[in-house]
Amino acid sequence: MVSYTLGDIKAAELKSRLAMTMKGTVLECDNARAIHFLASTALMREGAPFDADFIVKELRFLNSKGTPYPWDMNYYSRVFDRVVTQNIIAYYAKHHNLNMVAAAQGMLERRRLPKNDHEYTYSPGYSRYANYDEYFGSLDSMTANQLRDYIVFMHEKHDNDVLAQFILQQNKYRNPSYFNDLLGTKLIAEGRFSEALPVLKKVPLSYVNGLGIALIMAHRDYKKPRWFFKQRVKDIYDLGVDEELEKVSLKYNQKITFCEDMSRLEQRYELAKLANNATRPELAMQLAVRYYQASCYGDCWYLTHYDKPCDDSTRAWEKDFAQQAMTYLDVAKKDVKLKQEALYARAYVQLNVTTNGSWYGYDFKEYQQLLK
């Protein structure tokens, strides 16, 4: 183990293989086998031939060593976690196999959490879970197309891949409502509103009502301009918890109405653009309001995300909703009646994209420059 820690993986593999031939207590023999497994998979990670049969055999061995201790106090569980995290997941990440990376992370989360633990519902609406769960983080980092591929991957048999079979047997979470909601939300974030509709319509309202974002969804409206006022909700983020507000019952899924609204408005805008219609600036203002509200900076961030960190920004694979709002505001400002609001909105958007509305990021000189 000293050789492995010092970075000499080949020496660690050789010494641990020799140690496995020696006599000792059960724990000593298991230690030698665990170190050999760790070193061998590290070599595979670095380019040695990948032996899936060997990996599955060793993972099954670790699984068989049940103890009465919880995961973090169980030596064999920690070996399992370390090998999978450091070597197996790293191997698949190196080979850009996002499906196996996500599946393996899901397997580890499944092992760490008791079956009856509330957190195991994998509800992305619980921000505390989204913040600390690597499985959700992996899924959340995928594009919509990548997530769709992963959903297909989860339901395949993988007859020719024993490791994929093993991992997916350990990671059995397949709730269609969860994955359809996640996929539909990603499609919205990419600006693919028409594609998102049939996916989101598969999600029962009862499921949406159980998400942590339901409270916020019930009390915010994406049609109200963010640059005029903030729609406050009495939840744990705004002045404590209001128990009465927590017991909300959604009448409809706002993600669906948003997609319908955006699809209709964008079609009308394109027609007005072709005909050089006078309604174009007004339609542009309506689209700007909606795009900004649904961005990670707006009050209705829950339409495209499951949490709102104070330092969030548009992700590389998402459509830049704030920038799209600016594009529409540039059209709206050409109308005399809308010019004042459009110019004010542009200054507001530019400032908040820089600071995300955080007081500690406020720079008065920069603000003055933006207003010029």
Residue ranges and their predicted role:
Residues 1-372:
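Extracytoplasmic/secretory-pathway proteins
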